[in-house]
Amino acid sequence: MSDKNPRYSRILLKLSGEALAGTKDMGIDTEVLDKMSLSIAHLRGLGVQVGIVVGGGNLYRGAQLQKEGLVGRVTGDQMGMLATVMNGLAMRDALERRNIKTRLMSALPIGEVTESYSSRNAIRYLKNGEVCIFVAGTGNPFFTTDTAACLRGIEIEAGLILKATKVDGVYDKDPSLHSDAVKYDGLTFDEVLEQKLGVMDLTAIALCREHDVPLQVFDMNKPNALLNVVMGENEGTRVYH
């Protein structure tokens, strides 16, 4: 594999908050941060340009508060956006400890903490060899960070959007609950939408389909899985037009 060139020169990686929590129920697992920053360092060493969208579910889950009427949907979503900023700060520092220059770009203006998101600036940074972490989702309530990942991937002209999960791809049903669950090696966007497989929310899938940007779902805990995907190896589940 070391003799091959990467299949993709620019990617968008989606890291959910739950993935960052690792084996914990909440919070950030430092081992996950360390492993992921190392994987990204390997990609940068191969010249791959990397954009990252992080979720916030490991720090804030608003469903219960909203259910109990303590906060409204808009407020809850805004709290979730702020949680992604905290995750982004942690990921930025993990990357910079490996001497990888990293930009933290927010869809919400947060003066002294991040810079405001601009697709033109992001592409410029990526071309200069910097990693860009995109936080605060789309900046709007009612949109998931999965949708934000697809949107940012399209805006920065990524060749592939990768979703890092705790399972090794997409199954016809939850493999943690059903021993007979069947894994898909490949699916079309239409099949995902028709079967409602839950790869990402429907808005995110529709965006990728409309702009013909492939999606790869892989197990972030499997050694070298991220590198394998970018090198074009068979890993996880591919969703395509």
Swiss-Prot record:
Pathway: Pyrimidine metabolism; CTP biosynthesis via de novo pathway; UDP from UMP (UMPK route): step 1/1
Residues making up the signal peptide according to the UniProt record: none
Main subcellular location of this protein, as a coarse class: cytoplasm
Pfam families: AA_kinase
One of the GO biological process terms: 'de novo' CTP biosynthetic process
EC class of the enzyme, as a word: transferase
Catalytic activity field: UMP + ATP = UDP + ADP
Positions that bind ATP: K14, L15, S16, G17, G57, R61, T165, Y171, D174
Keyword match Membrane: no
Function as written in the Swiss-Prot or TrEMBL entry: Catalyzes the reversible phosphorylation of UMP to UDP.
Self-association and partners: Homohexamer.
Family, per entry: Belongs to the UMP kinase family.
Listed name of the protein: Uridylate kinase
Organism: Psychrobacter cryohalolentis (strain ATCC BAA-1226 / DSM 17306 / VKM B-2378 / K5)
Organism ancestry: Bacteria, Pseudomonadati, Pseudomonadota, Gammaproteobacteria, Moraxellales
